[in-house]
C-alpha cells in the first residue's frame, strides 16, 4: 500500500492536485487502522511507518483526532467524505478505461478486471430510481443513532406530503428549526434507507409524528424489525462470481399498507367489522379492497437494495405483475416474504397477498403457462403470459367476464382460478373441469320451463345460453 501511495503521490504532486492527494492520504490512514492521536505502549512497524508518513503530511493533532474519532462521525460528515470519494473513484475509472482503449494496452485479463471494477463501482455508487443510496462505504464503523424523530410533513398541495427523519427527539414545533437527515416522498423509502445505512438498530428509539397518516409506533417498530430480519446487516461481501454475472433479484419483502388504514371508518368508531366475506381483495358485503399499497423491497445479487411502490386500487395486481415479469426475465424466483402491520386485519392481508403471489407464480411461470383469473371487488382480471410478459385483461363486471370466457380461442389455454375468484358460483366449478380436446355440456333447470346450458369446448372457451324445455329428459334428448 505504501509503495502504491508513493506512486500516486508523485503523480498528484506533479499535477498540483493537493485535494486529491489529501483524499488518498485519508484513505491510506483509514486502511492502516491505527490511531496515532492516542498514546500506546506498542511501537509496531505499522504505527512507526504511519507516524513517519503523518509527519511528512504535516497533519496536526486536531486532524489526527478527527480521523481517529471516525466512529463519532454522523451522516453529514460521512456524506461529504463519500461524495468526494465517489467523484474520485468514478473519474479514475473512466480515465483508466479511456487510457487503456486509446493506447491499446488492455488485454483479455485486464478487460475482465476493468469490467468487474466497473460493476463494483456501479453497484456501490450508481444512482437510479428506487435504489437505496449507501452513504457509508466503510468510512465510519457505526452510524447508528440512539434517538431519532420521524415526521410526516405537508407540502403545498393536499397530496404533496413527505416523510423526514431527524436526529434526536423533537417535538412538532421544533421540526421547522432542524434540517432532516433525509426526506422522501414515501415512508418505505425512508425506513429502508435508515436500515441499509445502519442509522436504526434494535436499540434506537424513534419519536413519531404521523401527520395525516395512520402510522403508529407499533407499526413502525415492526416494519423496521421486518427489514432487520429479511435483510440483516452487514450484508455478505460482494464476490467476483456475483459481479461476473448480471444482477438478479435474490430476496423480496412486500410491505403492505405502510402507514395506511384500510378500514378508517371502523377505526374511528372503534368498531370491528365481522363478515363471512374475508377476502382482502373483496372484504365484507361491500367487497372492499383492503390492499391499498404495496412497497416491494428487493435485494439483488450485487447487494443493491431497491424499493418499488404500487398504490391505488390496482396496487396488488401491479406489484404481482412486476414480480412475475422480473422472475421470468431473470429465470429466477427471488425468495418472497410479505409483512403487514396496519391497524385492521393485518395478518389476514399479509397471508392473502403471500398466497396470491405463490399461486399466480405457480400458474403463470409454469411451462406451458396457464391464464390466471383474479377477482378484485366486483371486477375481474385475467393475467396471461404473452411473449414473456404478463398481460392484464380487465373486465368490469360478471357480464363482461362471461363474454370473455365465451370468445373463441386459437389454441387450448387452461384458465386457473384464484382461490377466492367466483366463490360459490357454478361457473368456477365448470372452468375447473376444462380439458384439452374435450367438449363438455352442463345444464341447469330453471323455473318457467327454462334451462341454462353451458358448453365448455376443447380449447377452453365457455359458452352459455338459455332455452325453453319441457322437462329434463326432453332437454337431454
Question: What residues fall within each predicted segment?
Answer:
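Extended, well-ordered protein cores
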Residues: 34, 43-48, 52, 432-433, ...
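Short, hydrophobic/amphipathic alpha-helical patches that form generic packing surfaces
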Residues: 6-9, 22-37
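Long C-terminal appendages of very large multidomain proteins
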Residues: 56, 91-477
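Eukaryote-biased recognition of C-terminal alpha-helical segments
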Residues: 65-108
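Eukaryote-specific, cytoplasm-facing alpha-helical/coiled-coil scaffolding segments in long proteins
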Residues: 49-62
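Structured mid-domain segments that build the active-site/substrate or prosthetic-cofactor binding neighborhood
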Residues: 1-17
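C-terminal subdomain of alpha/beta-hydrolase-fold enzymes, centered on the catalytic histidine
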Residues: 22-25, 51, 73-80
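Structured alpha-helical bundle/scaffold domains in large eukaryotic membrane-trafficking regulators
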Residues: 39-43, 65
Amino acid at each position: 500500500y505504501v509503495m502504491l501511495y508513493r506512486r500516486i503521490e508523485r503523480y498528484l504532486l506533479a499535477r498540483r492536485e493537493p485535494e486529491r492527494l489529501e483524499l488518498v492520504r485519508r484513505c491510506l490512514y483509514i486502511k492502516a487502522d491505527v490511531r496515532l492521536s492516542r498514546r500506546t505502549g506498542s511501537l509496531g512497524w505499522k504505527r512507526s511507518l504511519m507516524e513517519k508518513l503523518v509527519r511528512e503530511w504535516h497533519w496536526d493533532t486536531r486532524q489526527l483526532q478527527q480521523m481517529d474519532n471516525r466512529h463519532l462521525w454522523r451522516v453529514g460528515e460521512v456524506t461529504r467524505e463519500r461524495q468526494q470519494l465517489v467523484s474520485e473513484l468514478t473519474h479514475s475509472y473512466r480515465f483508466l478505461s479511456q487510457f487503456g482503449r486509446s493506447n491499446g494496452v488492455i488485454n483479455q485479463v485486464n478487460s475482465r478486471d476493468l469490467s468487474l471494477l466497473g460493476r463494483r463501482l456501479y453497484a456501490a455508487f450508481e444512482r437510479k430510481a428506487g435504489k437505496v443510496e449507501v452513504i457509508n462505504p466503510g468510512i465510519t464503523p457505526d452510524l447508528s443513532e440512539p434517538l431519532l424523530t420521524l415526521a410526516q410533513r405537508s407540502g403545498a398541495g393536499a397530496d404533496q406530503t413527505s416523510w423526514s427523519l431527524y436526529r434526536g427527539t423533537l417535538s412538532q414545533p421544533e421540526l421547522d428549526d432542524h434540517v432532516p437527515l433525509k426526506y422522501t416522498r414515501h415512508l418505505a423509502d425512508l425506513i429502508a434507507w435508515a436500515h441499509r445505512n445502519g442509522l436504526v438498530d434494535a436499540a434506537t428509539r424513534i419519536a413519531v409524528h404521523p401527520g395525516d397518516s395512520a402510522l403508529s409506533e407499533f407499526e413502525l417498530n415492526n416494519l423496521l424489525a421486518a427489514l432487520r430480519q429479511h435483510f440483516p446487516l452487514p450484508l455478505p461481501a460482494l464476490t467476483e462470481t456475483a459481479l461476473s454475472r448480471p444482477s438478479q433479484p435474490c430476496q423480496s419483502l412486500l410491505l403492505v399498507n405502510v402507514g395506511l388504514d384500510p378500514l378508517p371508518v371502523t377505526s374511528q368508531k372503534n368498531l370491528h367489522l365481522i363478515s363471512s366475506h374475508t377476502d382482502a381483495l373483496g372484504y365484507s358485503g361491500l367487497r372492499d379492497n383492503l390492499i391499498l399499497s404495496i412497497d416491494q423491497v428487493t435485494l439483488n445479487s450485487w447487494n443493491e437494495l431497491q424499493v418499488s411502490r404500487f398504490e391505488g386500487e390496482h396496487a396488488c395486481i401491479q406489484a404481482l405483475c412486476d414480480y412475475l415479469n422480473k422472475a421470468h426475465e431473470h429465470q429466477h424466483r427471488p425468495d418472497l416474504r410479505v409483512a403487514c402491520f396496519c391497524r385492521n386485519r393485518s395478518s389476514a392481508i399479509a397471508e392473502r397477498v403471500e398466497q396470491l403471489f405463490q399461486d399466480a407464480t405457480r400458474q403463470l411461470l409454469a411451462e406451458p403457462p396457464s391464464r390466471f383469473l383474479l377477482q378484485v371487488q366486483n371486477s375481474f382480471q385475467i393475467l396471461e403470459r404473452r411473449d414473456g410478459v404478463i398481460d392484464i385483461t380487465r373486465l368490469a363486471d360478471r357480464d363482461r367476464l362471461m363474454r370473455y370466457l365465451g370468445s373463441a380461442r386459437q389454441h387450448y389455454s387452461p384458465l386457473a382460478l384464484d382461490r377466492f375468484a367466483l366463490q360459490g358460483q357454478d361457473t368456477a366449478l365448470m372452468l375447473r373441469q376444462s380439458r384439452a380436446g374435450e367438449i363438455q355440456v352442463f345444464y341447469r333447470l330453471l323455473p318457467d320451463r327454462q334451462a341454462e346450458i353451458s358448453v365448455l369446448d376443447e380449447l377452453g372457451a365457455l359458452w352459455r345460453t338459455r332455452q325453453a324445455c319441457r322437462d329434463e329428459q326432453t332437454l337431454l334428448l
